[in-house]
Amino acid sequence: MNDRRSFEQMLACYCAPVLKKHKAANMFHMDKAKNLSIFALIREYNEKLSGKQIQIKVLQPANSRITIFVFQTKKLQQILKRKDVMLFLQSFGYPLPCSLQTLFAHLEQRLSMATAYPHEIGVLLGYPLHDVVGFIEQRECLLRGHWNVYRHPRKAMQMFSLFERCSKELMRGVRHGIPIEQLI
């Protein structure tokens, strides 16, 4: 399988809800050694998706295993403007309000710390703040799916179902050779 096809399959599998505008962001990991043209592909797809207000950011580009963060610019900015989210992220040292570039620089710094994974990233992915806090505090969850749910399980189940439909639709299209930018 070529690098482009592999990359599109990863986008369809992990980021369909973002690409279909139902979620602020999502991420996945790739081994650089298995996809040698990954940075060129990301530049290409950033160009293809820019008119749709979707961006792809590489986190930890020096690592052998990189994190690919796909996000809707406006939705992420809206999340960051919420007072409760700002206070939450500021408690982890994020210098809010700030540009997305500054936000990602701080997130990179947090990811590079060996002590613990920065689970506050869940808020950036668009998960409900109360669910991110519940996860960090290791509470008992009510439901597990795309994220651990601590409140409003019925609403979360509806979102999980929507996300699954998006992924299946995009994966089917990619399998049939349709470019991802034509599927969204």
List each model region and its residues.
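A glycine-rich, hydrophobic loop/mini-helix early in the fold
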Residues: 41-98
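Short acidic alpha-helix initiation/capping motifs at coil-to-helix transition points
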Residues: 80-81, 109-116, 139-141
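Long, compositionally biased
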Residues: 146-184
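Short, surface-exposed beta-edge/turn micro-motifs
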Residues: 23-25, 64-66, 118-120
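Hydrophobic/aromatic-rich, well-ordered segments within soluble, folded domains that form packed cores
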Residues: 117-143
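A structured, charge-rich N-terminal accessory region that forms the first stable segment of a protein
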Residues: 2-62
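Internal catalytic-core helix/loop-beta-alpha segment
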Residues: 92-119
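Short linear loop/turn motifs
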Residues: 63-64, 102-104, 136-152
